[in-house]
């Protein structure tokens, strides 16, 4: 199993709670560039008022507005895969910087480890190859739509 994912999950499970004062450590400007290269084919960032902050018009992936600190698999109106719903809605997976990085770099592998289920699947097949890009994308999403 990917050692990065195991390391992240161990740290996440050791943490007692998600702090309200969370932040992102990446470069949001570089994250905007990476988001526009790697994420816009599937995702948008649209406010609750309907203002599009990023992306095109794709709806194959969920709206990523306010993803930082949100429960995984819980955006209203999007049909998530069963494994992600179980991880987030049923087991409380929150998109912290660490969990976001681990997930976007290997969605299926992350869910298999998090759920301890070899049959876990992810609807997201794309993988962000570079950790730095994933960190920067999280910083960008945090900046334009943090709760």
Task: Locate predicted features.
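Positively charged n-region of N-terminal signal peptides that target proteins for export
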Residues: 1-4
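Bacterial N-terminal signal peptides
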Residues: 6-15
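A generic structural signal for secondary-structure junctions
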Residues: 9, 47, 69-72, 105
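Electrostatic cytochrome c docking/interface patches
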Residues: 17-36, 46-54, 60
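C-type cytochrome heme c attachment motif
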Residues: 33-45, 62-66, 101-105, 123-125, ...
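Axial heme c-ligation environment in periplasmic c-type cytochrome domains
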Residues: 50-55, 76-99, 105-133
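N-terminal, post-signal-peptide region of Sec/Tat-exported proteins
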Residues: 50-76
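Short, solvent-exposed mixed-charge patches
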Residues: 146-147
């Amino acid at each position: 199993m990917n050692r990065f994912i195991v390391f992240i999950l161990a740290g996440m499970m050791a943490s007692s709670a998600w702090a309200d004062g969370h932040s992102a450590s990446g470069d949001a400007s570089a994250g905007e560039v990476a988001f526009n290269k790697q994420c816009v084919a599937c995702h948008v960032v649209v406010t609750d008022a309907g203002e599009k902050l990023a992306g095109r018009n794709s709806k194959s992936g969920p709206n990523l507005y306010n993803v930082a600190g949100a429960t995984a698999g819980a955006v209203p109106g999007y049909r998530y895969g069963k494994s992600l719903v179980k991880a987030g809605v049923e087991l409380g997976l929150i998109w912290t910087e660490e969990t976001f990085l681990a997930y976007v770099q290997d969605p299926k592998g992350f869910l298999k480890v998090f759920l301890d289920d070899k049959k876990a699947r992810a609807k997201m097949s794309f993988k962000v190859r570079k950790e730095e890009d994933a960190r920067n994308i999280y910083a960008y999403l945090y900046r334009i739509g943090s709760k």
